[in-house]
């Protein structure tokens, strides 16, 4: 299951006139295969999500949840439909759409020999954020990893690694964050802690 978080890191609660920060109209994705025929991963999906809203996408494996995220992330090309993210049209402004989205993947894939601070600095660099404009320490505090900022990623607990993935998704201050099955494979206590961090956002 995928949890969709719509946020403004600085002042989400100050926006009284909420607008649709994510708008999906008749989104369709068909995977063509000459041997097995066409697979309709998404069929005329319509969705509007407002700023500040927490929204969940629920469904079994193969329901198209990951395909939906990958289309917005730019790694899968849609067959038809309109996608608007933070006011940017996916067809006309794909780079701006990608910059408006942060994704917390299900799989924990972190370089074990880099510290959380180093990983966030590298991530910021990928988005072209100048050093003077980076908010690395703020993000580390937001996910309660400031004390582990200079530790090797391999030394972090499972919960800390999950929070570090969340920090990576937030480092470029996107207005939309996707969490792909954030509680998969974790115990009850860790699950509660993860949701606590989500609510704090």
Locations of the language-model features?
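Walker A (P-loop) phosphate-binding loop of ABC-type ATPase nucleotide-binding domains
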Residues: 60-63
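Conserved ABC transporter NBD signature motif
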Residues: 81-89, 97
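Conserved ABC ATPase signature
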Residues: 152-156
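Conserved catalytic motifs of ABC-family nucleotide-binding domains
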Residues: 173
